[in-house]
């Protein structure tokens, strides 16, 4: 808590780095003057046509800034001479993200954090379109977060780097790349809805990267709020072990504050000064028994992490407050449990204790294992980088953002070492050196120049030309390649064309920049039918892309009907012998190969394996076989969709001393693919979505009937407060286009739904035949 000795606590001050408190001061307009915009580099017409004619462009990150006034009131580094002097010890760094289902209150919570820490001078509201972190026009209009936004603030002498992430499933990539570079996370839950589908998705993403987290049950002021039901859902839906460290005092309109079980005190907000003041009082009498019960459960759980504390507890001696915090921190960082807190960000209650928990329980970079990578020259060799300024520099580029005044900005998490403006770094993935133009600390879409970045920092770099999302930047003399991120494949596509021929080049420029920012967005150009196709994670994702083309690149476009990204696979093993022979005077072409095609588990992708023995196919020709097969995997034999979950095994072959070549074996592999896949029982796969519909009970029958008509499979039913029913179903994506309009119509606008990709499954034969026929007609 910010001031433990005082019963009356005021918090709209920020901690200065020397330990004193200061009030925020209003910035003078003169502070914003003298900013000289730098022109961003544009692509030439020739380079545009080169890119536009390529089969696919896909790279990395976020959005284009509009506000350009740099914030000067937060200096990140104190400079001494020509070197950086760390003003905040690394142990006091917290790199955190805020993640949750859509509308759980992520951005609202972040806005309160920025206000109470003194970073902002007023509270921005999502519903008013004034939230600092939702700076894009589309975000302000729709009231949702589309791109992750980064900022830095301070609390109790700790530096907190925050990334606010989207909750909509279409923008799950933003959550993925944020969690990849964060040390801890706050997972928000709506106290009425509990654990929702996208909450489960982001929880699994955090599990994947081993991110310690704390839970905040938000919206305790809402009708139907139930802290204890949400706590139970954390167990049943997420398989996690919640450690309750706060209890609510009241709920709905009577929600007044929380019981802090660590200190065994109640924290009550009066509603004055936007929640900046609160009282620390004794636990109310009617809640003392319940508080003692949950406090005992908390202590019994945490003393398992310390033998002395356990021994004392068995002898009737409770650990003191400092020991309790230390043990909660230990269990949180080891992911043995997740602390659970509660509050109402919108009503300004519970946010300051949440900030205390970030400082007390979430890890600093020093609390986590050393970052592991590989040697670029020898990928089998593991290299470690410890979080220290004295280590060689190593950082991961996790986001690209276009800025109209600075150009392309590359967001980097610095894991080790120092980075200064004007220095050179090595892109270890590409083996290219890059020069750092400027180092910028970001606050949403405003920026401030800094001279040096140190271990633990999240910084934006200007001037990089060849680095994309997921690539490693490092000291040229000490190269290391860090683990890359996984990017989801698009599941939906639409055809798009500019309304006027004059906009062709402008649209190409826009698509290239948007694809560089967002690795989950792809586009391709089919010159034969003169059509451009854009691909993304859902209808909303592509709708935002088209809207950004219009607003940011001034391109009006005609958009076709959505189409599904199907896949092709095989159902059985087949072996084929293929001989490629061509003789037309001079040196001919000869390659003889035998390839076995085997089905693999769903989600396995493609795998090549060589079982050649005795030099039947020389080693120098095997790469030709690999390349030929890989080229074919993007164009299946049924309807031209990508082929997945197939293992190709080169088992035998022969060659000619004169006529054989890498090209000959590459062409032979193509022929073997066409024949072999047809023999292996080819089949088409379609994306199946997990759909959750929340509807009033009187419309339940209509909803179920409609889902059944869409080839849906009903999995389960559930209840929600207010007489609402929950339908959980699996439905093919092809049947879900424009579903929102249908659902609103049959329920008079009272139902809602969410959906996310669950799996790929076999397409029914009659639909497969229709798709194959359609592809043949297009080809003809």
From Swiss-Prot:
SMART domains: EFG_C, EFG_IV. The keyword Glycosyltransferase does not apply. InterPro entries: EF_G_plantC, EFG_II, EFG_III, EFG_III/V, EFG_IV, EFG_V, EFG_V-like, EFTu-like_2. GO terms for cellular component: chloroplast. Residues 91-366 form the tr-type G domain. Pfam families: EFG_C, EFG_III, EFG_IV, GTP_EFTU, GTP_EFTU_D2. CDD domains: EF-G (cd01886), EFG_III (cd16262), EFG_mtEFG1_IV (cd01434), EFG_mtEFG_C (cd03713), EFG_mtEFG_II (cd04088). Keywords: Chloroplast, Elongation factor, GTP-binding, Nucleotide-binding, Plastid, Protein biosynthesis, Transit peptide. It is found in: Plastid, Chloroplast. Residues 1-79 form a transit peptide. Signal peptide: none annotated. NCBIfam families: EF-G (TIGR00484), PRK12740.1-3 (NF009379), PRK12740.1-5 (NF009381), small_GTP (TIGR00231). PANTHER family: RIBOSOME-RELEASING FACTOR 2, MITOCHONDRIAL, TRANSLATION ELONGATION FACTOR G-RELATED. HAMAP family: EF_G_EF_2_B, EF_G_plantC. Chloroplast-localized elongation factor EF-G involved in protein synthesis in plastids. Catalyzes the GTP-dependent ribosomal translocation step during translation elongation. During this step, the ribosome changes from the pre-translocational (PRE) to the post-translocational (POST) state as the newly formed A-site-bound peptidyl-tRNA and P-site-bound deacylated tRNA move to the P and E sites, respectively. Catalyzes the coordinated movement of the two tRNA molecules, the mRNA and conformational changes in the ribosome. This is Elongation factor G-2, chloroplastic. It comes from Glycine max. The lineage of its organism: Eukaryota, Viridiplantae, Streptophyta, Embryophyta, Tracheophyta.
């Amino acid at each position: 808590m910010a001031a433990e000795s005082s019963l009356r606590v005021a918090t709209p001050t920020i901690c200065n780095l020397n330990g004193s408190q200061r009030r925020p001061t209003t910035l003078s307009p003169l502070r914003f003057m003298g900013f000289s915009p730098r022109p961003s580099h544009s692509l030439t017409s020739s380079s545009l046509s080169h890119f536009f004619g390529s089969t696919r462009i896909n790279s990395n990150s976020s959005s284009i800034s509009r506000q350009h006034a740099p914030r000067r009131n937060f200096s990140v580094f104190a400079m001494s001479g020509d070197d950086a002097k760390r003003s905040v010890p690394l142990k006091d760094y917290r790199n955190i993200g805020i993640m949750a289902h859509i509308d759980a209150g992520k951005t609202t919570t972040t806005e309160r954090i920025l206000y109470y820490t003194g970073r902002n001078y007023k509270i921005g509201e999502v519903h008013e379109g004034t939230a600092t972190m939702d700076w894009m026009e589309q975000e302000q209009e729709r009231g949702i977060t589309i791109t992750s936004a980064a900022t830095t603030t301070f609390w109790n002498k700790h530096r907190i780097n925050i990334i606010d992430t989207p909750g909509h499933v279409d923008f799950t990539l933003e959550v993925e790349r944020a969690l990849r570079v964060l040390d801890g996370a706050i997972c928000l839950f709506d106290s009425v809805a509990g654990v929702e589908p996208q909450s489960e998705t982001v929880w699994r993403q955090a599990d994947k990267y081993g991110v310690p987290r704390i839970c905040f049950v938000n919206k305790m002021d809402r009708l139907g709020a139930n802290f204890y039901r949400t706590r139970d859902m954390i167990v049943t839906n997420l398989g996690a072990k919640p450690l309750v460290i706060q209890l609510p005092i009241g709920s709905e309109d009577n929600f007044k504050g929380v019981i802090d079980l660590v200190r065994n005190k109640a924290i009550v907000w009066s509603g004055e000064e936007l929640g900046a003041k609160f009282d620390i009082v004794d636990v109310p009498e009617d809640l003392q028994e319940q508080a003692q019960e949950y406090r005992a459960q908390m202590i019994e759980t945490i003393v398992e992490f310390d033998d002395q504390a356990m021994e004392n507890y068995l002898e009737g001696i409770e650990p003191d407050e400092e020991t309790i915090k230390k043990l909660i921190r230990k269990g949180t960082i080891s992911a043995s449990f997740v602390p659970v807190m509660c509050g109402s960000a919108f009503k300004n209650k519970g946010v300051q204790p949440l900030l205390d928990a970030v400082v007390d329980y979430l890890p600093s970079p020093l609390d986590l294992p050393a970052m592991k990578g590989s040697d670029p020259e020898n990928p089998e060799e593991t290299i470690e980088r410890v979080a220290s300024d004295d280590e060689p520099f190593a950082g991961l580029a996790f986001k690209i953002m276009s800025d109209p005044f600075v150009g392309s900005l590359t967001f980097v998490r610095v894991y080790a070492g120092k980075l200064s403006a004007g220095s050179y770094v090595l892109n270890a993935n590409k083996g290219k050196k890059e020069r750092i133009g400027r180092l910028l600390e970001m606050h949403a879409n405003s920026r401030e120049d800094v001279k040096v970045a140190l271990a633990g920092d999240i910084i934006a770099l200007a001037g990089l030309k060849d680095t994309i999302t997921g690539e490693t930047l490092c000291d040229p003399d000490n190269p290391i390649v860090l683990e890359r991120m996984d990017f989801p494949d698009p599941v939906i596509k639409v055809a798009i064309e500019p309304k006027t021929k004059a906009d062709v080049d402008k649209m190409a420029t826009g698509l290239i920049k948007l694809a560089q920012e967002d690795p989950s967005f792809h586009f391709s150009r089919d010159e034969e039918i003169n059509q451009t196709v854009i691909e993304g994670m859902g209808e909303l994702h592509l709708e935002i892309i088209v809207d950004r083309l219009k607003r940011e690149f001034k391109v009006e476009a005609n958009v076709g009907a959505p189409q599904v990204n199907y896949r092709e696979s095989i159902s059985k093993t087949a072996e084929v012998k293929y001989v490629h022979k061509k003789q037309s005077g001079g040196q001919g072409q000869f390659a003889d190969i035998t390839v076995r095609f085997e089905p693999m588990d769903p989600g396995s992708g493609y795998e090549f394996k060589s079982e050649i023995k005795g030099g039947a196919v020389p080693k120098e020709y095997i790469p030709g076989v690999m390349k030929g097969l890989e080229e074919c995997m993007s164009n299946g034999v049924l309807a031209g969709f990508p082929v997945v979950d197939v293992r190709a095994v080169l088992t035998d072959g022969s060659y000619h001393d004169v006529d054989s070549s890498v090209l000959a074996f590459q062409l032979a592999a193509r022929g073997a693919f066409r024949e072999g896949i047809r023999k292996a029982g080819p089949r088409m796969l379609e994306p199946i979505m997990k759909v959750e519909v929340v509807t009033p009970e009187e419309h339940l029958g209509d909803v179920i009937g409609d889902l059944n008509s869409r080839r849906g499979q009903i999995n389960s039913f559930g209840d929600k407060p207010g007489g609402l029913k929950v339908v959980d179903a699996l439905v093919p994506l092809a049947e879900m286009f424009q579903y929102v309009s249908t659902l609103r119509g049959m329920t008079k606008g009272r139902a809602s739904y969410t959906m996310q990709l669950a799996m790929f499954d076999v397409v029914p034969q009659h639909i497969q035949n229709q798709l194959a026929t359609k592809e043949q007609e297009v080809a003809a």
